[in-house]
Amino acid sequence: MTVFAALYTDEDMSALVATLLRSRGLDITTVPEQATLGKTDREQLEFATAQGRCLLTHNRVDFERLHLQYMEEDRQHYGIIVVPQKNAYEVAQRIGILVSTLMADEINNQLLYA
């Protein structure tokens, strides 16, 4: 059982957030690192799911809709964490607190707000 969720930032998330979380020892990758820039939100969630990663986003509206669609279709994902657009240090702190208090399997199929 994995303690901390593996993370994937969507393209709207600052690269500094990934750097800060990585410095805390978290397993995180980004859209530019995975060459998935320009993919739709659904494709980003599908990619994160295929990689076993929780998706981090500022895009509340679209990912709330996608989460509901996944649940209605009885599809699985590794979690979605929505974070308000703040400075990168605050965003990283919010995410760090959330993922350090929940085990990876507790995040699966959840839509969470940091």
Enumerate the predicted regions with their spans.
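Acidic, PIN/NYN-like endoribonuclease modules and their adjacent C-terminal/linker elements
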Residues: 1-11, 15, 20-23, 36, ...
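Conserved BB-loop
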Residues: 27-39
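Long, hydrophilic "mature protein body" segments
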Residues: 22-24, 32, 50
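Short catalytic-loop micro-motif centered on adjacent basic/acidic residues
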Residues: 30-32, 55, 82
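Acidic, metal-binding active-site segment of PIN/NYN-like and related structure-specific nucleases
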Residues: 47-49, 53-66
